[in-house]
Amino acid sequence: MTMIRLLRLVVWLIGLSTALAQTPQKVVDIPTRAGVTQRMIVLAPPEPKAAVVLMAGGHGGLQISPNGSMKWGEGNFLMRTRQQFADQGLLVAVVDAPSDRQTLPFLNGFR
């Protein structure tokens, strides 16, 4: 293998590894009023260009666990593509229903 081919391969592998690197997600709980918190998943790339707030339709009760998994909504288009938004340099916030609305009917009839 010539030196130029080797260099091209190295550059290609670096580009591939950068493209496959995912922005880690973090679960954040924000106190909103007495005894109530607002949980969200935040994906923050190193230098975000802008921010997007993603909210699932329907009843809105994602039931985000501390590890970032969801009991409902993983199939929702915005929830599925949150990493792609972050990959484009956007800070992403996926918002759950507030802690006092974590059972049926969640946000139905509330918002």
Where are these regions (language model features)?
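Sec-dependent signal peptide recognition
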Residues: 2-12
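N-terminal signal peptide c-region/cleavage motif recognized by signal peptidases
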Residues: 16-19
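N-terminal cap/lid segment of alpha/beta-hydrolase-fold proteins
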Residues: 22-47
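Sec/Tat-exported extracytoplasmic proteins
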Residues: 34, 56-59, 89
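Short, surface-exposed "cap/lid" segments of acyl-processing enzymes
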Residues: 45-84
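A fold-wide structural signal in alpha/beta-hydrolase
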Residues: 51, 86-96
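Solvent-exposed loop/turn segments at secondary-structure junctions
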Residues: 58-61, 98-102
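Alpha/beta-hydrolase active-site loop
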Residues: 76-77, 81, 87, 99-111
